[in-house]
Amino acid sequence: MARVKRGVVARARHKKILKQAKGYYGARSRVYRVAFQAVIKAGQYAYRDRRQRKRQFRQLWIARINAAARQNGLSYSRFIDGLKKASIEIDRKILADIAVFDKVAFAALVEKAKSALA
């Protein structure tokens, strides 16, 4: 039986990992063994943070809506409750955008929420 030499396969695998580790600091971008660990860890962080990003953006939107609602004399929870009672269905992403870029429209939404609560 012929001897199987795997130099080509190993070289390709190493090149692939080192390409993924491009831009990393020091040995992490040059030494295969270290680069492999760095790439694996980076993948774990990326996987985790893709899920965290959704939570963090929702937190940001809620903080912005709360700040804008309080400037108009209403807490976040009462504002959201008022919108639901007024059957206004705008998601938090759009509400936060309106709160930042169109203060007049947001004030009108707060007034509708207040009237629905009363």
Curated annotation (Swiss-Prot):
**What Gene Ontology terms describe where this protein resides (cellular component)?**
ribonucleoprotein complex; ribosome
Q: Which InterPro entries match?
A: Ribosomal_bL20, RIBOSOMAL_L20_CS, Ribosomal_protein_bL20_C
Q: Coiled coil: which residue ranges?
A: none
A Gene Ontology MF term for this entry? rRNA binding
Which Gene3D superfamilies does the UniProt record give?
A: 6.10.160.10, Ribosomal protein L20
This protein's UniProt keywords: Ribonucleoprotein, Ribosomal protein, RNA-binding, rRNA-binding
Q: Does the keyword Ribonucleoprotein apply?
A: yes
Supply one GO BP term: ribosomal large subunit assembly
Pfam families noted in UniProt: Ribosomal_L20
Does this UniProt record's set of keywords contain Ribonucleoprotein?
A: yes
Q: Do you know which PANTHER family this protein is assigned to?
A: 39S RIBOSOMAL PROTEIN L20
Q: Its family? A: Belongs to the bacterial ribosomal protein bL20 family.
Q: What does this protein do?
A: Binds directly to 23S ribosomal RNA and is necessary for the in vitro assembly process of the 50S ribosomal subunit. It is not involved in the protein synthesizing functions of that subunit.
UniProt name for this protein:
Large ribosomal subunit protein bL20
Q: Which organism is it from?
A: Photorhabdus laumondii subsp. laumondii (strain DSM 15139 / CIP 105565 / TT01)
